[in-house]
Amino acid sequence: MVKSYLKYEHAKAFGVVASTSSNIVWIANDRNSTGVGQAVVAANEEVLCWDIKKGELLSRWRDDTCTVPVTCIAQSRTDKDVFAVGYEDGSIRLWDSKISTVIVSFNGHKSAITQLDFDRSGIRLASGSKDTDIIIWDLVAEVGQFKLRGHKDQVTGLRFIEPLAEVQDEDGSRAMVLDGEKSSDGFILSTGKDSLLKLWDLSSRHCIETHISQTNGECWALGVSPGSEACITAGNDGEMKVWSLDVDGLAASVGRVDVATTKHLTDRGTLHRQNKDRALEVEFHPKKDYFAVHGSEKAVEIWRMRTEAEVKKGLLRKRRRRREKQKDPKQNEQEAEEDEGAVDVASADIGDVFVQYVVVRTGGKLRSAAWALPSGQKDLHILVGTTNNQLEYFNVPSKEKNDKKTKQDIPDYTRALSVDLPGHRADIRALSLSSDDKMLATAANGSLKIWNVKTQACIRTFECGYALSCAFLPGDKVVVVGTKSGELQLFDVASAALLDSVDAHEGAIWSLNVHPDGRSVVSGSADKSAKFWDFRIVQEEVLGTKRTTPKLKLVHSKTLKVSDDILCLKFSPDSKYIAAALLDNTVKVFFVDSLKLYLNLYGHKLPVLSMDISYDSKLIVTSSADKNIRIWGLDFGDCHKALFGHQDSILQVAFVPHNADSNGHHFFSSSKDRTIRYWDGDKFEQIQRLDGHHGEVWAMAVAHRGNFLVSAGHDKSIRVWDETDEQIFLEEEREREIEELYESTLTTSLERDGDTADANDEFGAASKQTTETLMAGERIAEALDLGMADLNLMKEYEQAKESNPNAAAPQRHIVFMALGNITAEAYVMSVLQKIKAAALHDALLVLPFASVPMLFTFLNLFAVRSMNIPLTCRILFFMLKTHHKQIVASRAMKAMLDGIRANLRATLKKQKDEMGFNLAALKVVGMQIRENSIKDYVDETWEEENHERSAKKRGFVHVA
């Protein structure tokens, strides 16, 4: 009989405040709230929404089908509940923050999304990626409109520029063109790592201007002022270039052809940051004349734009100094009188206009910063996300307020709030579960945290040294920690106090293990010794009194000296042996009572980093930096099997206790290759691979009942993997892995074929073949074959009925019968409607030209029967564009197209009349409501503005 195993699945992840892969977004609280707002941040593959004031997690956005990290987040300008989130695999998902669900997902880029921006109306989204392309997405039709190519390296900045076209009225006044011949699709400003600054016209879908944005290499950031009249590009060596953008000129150029020589972007000069590393972000304040810029250092620089009066004052001061250096005082007085009136602010150097206001020092290296605009506060507020897993919120007094309070040039900023408790500042190096599996201890550099496993809440935080190992002592009230400096520290969970600290070793304590009888603990160190410590209750005198109080202490009982550094120690569950892994690649097994050598295990080519002994004390499993796992027998020390387990160093192994599925010989291994693997120690087979971490998996802990596993990695996350009731078989797992490998190579080869055709064009189609689109294309082809066969069958039946009215109905395909005896066209339409709008074009590209006549036959039937006309038109026009040359060359298609045109035109005219009638009726109803509700004697323009303000937000329209 084939052996089955129980599957482990990812259940929950916690411990991450904000990951370093993405930017952060500040959003306002609800109107009735008193907080300072919320922070929307990436946490590996999830998006988290934090209340900044309370430090509470409000919502968690997770798509179970997505396992890659989030790389970019953007908020819609119109609907504040809608967020676009870009991922490392090039996919984009639109989330509704109120209900934490995906509205629509797009797939068009080949690599990580670096930039996202919504347009003013909120119905288009621009995305930039590491694959150098920019794609414009239509959020209403849920399709990619087109792709812009031009950058030679990743896109580092992207902003919509949408000037409102102005025309001269007959009376000479200027009026805005909101719609009509003069309105355009707008423009896009983009920067790339290739140091190019490009201005794209979205109407002509081409680049109209290109500039070198940096003099010394790459451009890493782009900031555009709120009015779009200026922008700043920043790159290496602290250099920032200021550009002025002629928005009026852009608006006037709409629809004109003779503007090829006109330059809309002008270089105004260069500013230099205090720090010389590369800039990561430039963020203009939405309402005030400030901008923030930062690199990866522990500081964010806030710059201020001077007022016209200040610039004039500065220029006059400079001229006065220049005159003072001259020798003729009479001439100086005459020039001074002339200069007072003739100061031209436009001629001022850019360094006189933009000045550094304050440098805000942060608690960690910066990853992202965002301006916060809490209601009713006039100061500047900035939210920063750092690389050490925390969010900080700073208050900076504005220039006006600072001038009133003090005469200091540099204002005093304050670190008002932070979100840092729900995570460690550094990588977690050790994990330990309590005996009842309800509490989890995690140790990192500088901190030890105790978590509730069920609620994922952080119960206690202790300050400690650089922790390398930790363990719960029997009773689960005390945790012992071994540090890099050689200290052993005892912490009391209940009182949140440090009980005792012992200078145990001269080197780092790499391993701790509690004796199975629970009365002692052993510590293994880099000072080539293992020390045994007994737990003793000592009566300690209270300072200043004669009273004594009982206190737990560690008392050194004996020492085991070895020839090399000890990296790992383990007691056997039967308390007979203790195994020590040494730096010389060997594992030595000693008797616990006499400390005499029992076995010497040779075989690994690099040091053994971890080991574990099975619960029946018969097997010992060791893992090493040589990527191998070795299973040994503890009776003779023979190597049962060497498994090439991972693609990188194997950091930890742990046996699963006697659970419902195993005999205690199953074990887990974790590695630097970001995976955890589940093994059968008797059959020497890999049972399952657990993917989820986005960095090295430093530590693991298996529950005492074996019903779950906890892992911690370089991505700062703590992940819980639950044992499920689902059974898995080894053959099926191997087949699934091979399928995944095949699918990944299949889609990449398809993409490569598509790229060679139009790689040099500046404008292309926004398409990408994925497994989903390939399967959708196959479903369409299958539906067309079934549908055509059924149409021919029913046609023959109709002909037979003419000669013989009593002819028996034919036996139709079982699919049509199962769906309630529906017609062939209804079945094909149902298949087309089930395909996501974003994937439809790519699915249609899978169809060979031989299937096009069949598809057009059904499109004609859809037009005749008025079945989902928007979808019918969309498919028809896309297929005409794609197969234009073949269709023109085919005689048979011409007659078919004539029929489709006539039927479609009649149906569209009918729908147009219906929509016009309904629109007119809605306008009448709206007028009646307004007449009945507003009774004020006010002018008409105010009434219209008020009505627009009270209108509801637009919802997303699903076409298909």
Q: What is the meaning of each model-derived region?
A:
Residues 11-45:
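Beta-strand-rich domains and repeat architectures in extracellular enzymes and scaffolds
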Residues 18-30, 67-75, 111-117, 153-180, ...:
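Canonical WD40 repeat/beta-propeller blade segments in eukaryotic WD-repeat proteins
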Residues 47-51, 92-95, 134-138, 158, ...:
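WD40-repeat beta-propellers
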Residues 42-43, 86-89, 128-131, 191-194, ...:
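Conserved strand-to-loop turn within each blade of WD40 beta-propeller repeats
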Residues 10-16, 58-65, 102-108, 144-150, ...:
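Short C-terminal beta-strands that terminate individual repeats in beta-propeller domains
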Residues 34-40, 79-84, 102-104, 122-126, ...:
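Structural hallmark of WD40 beta-propellers
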Residues 55, 100, 142, 205, ...:
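Short coil/turn linkers that define WD40 beta-propeller blade boundaries
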Residues 3, 13, 239, 248-280, ...:
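Terminal intrinsically disordered, low-complexity extensions flanking WD-repeat/beta-propeller proteins
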